[in-house]
């Protein structure tokens, strides 16, 4: 997820139980032009393995060259191709979900990456179920990707036109899993252990992928594992623990070489901080305050005030 799954957040998710992770997606053209900012999106630590680097683009040969270049920098455990991003600026460059409308071009991209990688690491794909409700072609696309050498496919159960509205269509995801021999990983509307258990029970998927739920609740990985292993629903994480993690994330972001000065790091963190506030007492006011922070100290003060107010409330 662009702007979300950076090296710092992946570290946090790994500590909280994530099994396999993928970097923010990177432009193949940015990689080929030796853009330093783009290269930073591919960074990961060995502690985060297994981890894949996700690429997007519309030219199979260039995508393959970019994948090979990434492997030369620091070999990821796999290369993932993005056929799912619905964002206009990506679609306009014939990347992401735009290729779902053009299966020959999609096949050329998948084959190009597989050829460029040459078996050095597995190549996987992330996709949506179609461009819109009239062109749901996920089963066809999965078969094409399997023929092109993909070794696993993650399917998000919405069309490009849906964005993140409506419900994920797990019937289509199930049909994809039954149509190919390679693993299909289901994604969409997974926010708890109960959600994961239901989808694993009711569909033929080989695995499940948690996305947006982790943005406000990175404990979801640990909670889901506990439910799958024991059937027990974990107690909600205490507000104090939540703020401790928020502050740790801020400090890690500031010390990360990616963001530079503290002010820039905290400005980049604003959207992340607002996401963390989901379910916090007084979340609306907190988001308004966090949208303006420029230092860790400001977040510390906001956290202290939030905890003090919660302690004074009848339910605190």
Where are these regions (language model features)?
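Alpha/beta enzyme core
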Residues: 15, 61-95, 99-182
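Flexible loop residues that form catalytic
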Residues: 26, 84, 158, 189, ...
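Short secondary-structure capping/turn micro-motifs that flank functional sites
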Residues: 28-30, 86-87, 161-162, 193, ...
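Short, solvent-exposed helix-helix connector turns and helix-capping sites enriched
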Residues: 34-35, 102-103, 217, 261
């Amino acid at each position: 997820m662009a702007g979300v799954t950076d090296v710092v957040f992946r570290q946090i998710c790994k500590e909280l139980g994530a099994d396999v992770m993928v970097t923010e997606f990177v432009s193949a053209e940015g990689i080929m032009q030796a853009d330093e900012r783009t290269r930073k999106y591919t960074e990961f630590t060995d502690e985060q393995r297994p981890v894949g680097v996700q690429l997007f683009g519309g030219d199979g040969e260039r995508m393959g060259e970019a994948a090979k270049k990434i492997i030369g920098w620091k070999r990821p455990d796999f290369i993932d191709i993005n056929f799912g991003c619905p964002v206009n600026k990506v679609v306009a460059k014939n990347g992401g979900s735009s290729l779902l409308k053009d299966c020959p071009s999609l096949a050329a991209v998948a084959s190009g990456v597989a050829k460029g990688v040459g078996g050095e690491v597995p190549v996987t794909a992330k996709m949506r179920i179609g461009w819109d409700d009239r062109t749901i072609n996920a089963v066809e696309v999965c078969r094409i990707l399997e023929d092109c050498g993909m070794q696993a496919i993650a399917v998000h159960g919405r069309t490009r036109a849906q964005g993140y509205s409506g419900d994920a269509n797990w019937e289509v995801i199930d049909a994809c899993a039954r149509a190919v021999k390679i693993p299909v990983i289901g994604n969409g509307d997974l926010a708890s252990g109960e959600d994961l258990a239901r989808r694993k029970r009711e569909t033929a998927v080989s695995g499940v992928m948690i996305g947006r739920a982790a943005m406000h609740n990175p404990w979801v990985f640990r909670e889901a594992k506990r439910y799958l292993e024991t059937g027990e629903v974990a107690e909600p994480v205490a507000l104090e623990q939540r703020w401790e993690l928020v502050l740790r994330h801020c400090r890690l972001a500031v010390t990360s070489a990616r963001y530079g000065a503290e002010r820039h790091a905290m400005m980049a963190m604003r959207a992340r901080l607002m996401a963390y506030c989901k379910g916090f007492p007084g979340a609306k006011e907190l988001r308004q305050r966090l949208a303006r922070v420029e230092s860790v100290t400001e977040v510390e003060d906001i956290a202290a005030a939030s905890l003090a107010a919660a302690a004074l409330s009848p339910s605190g």
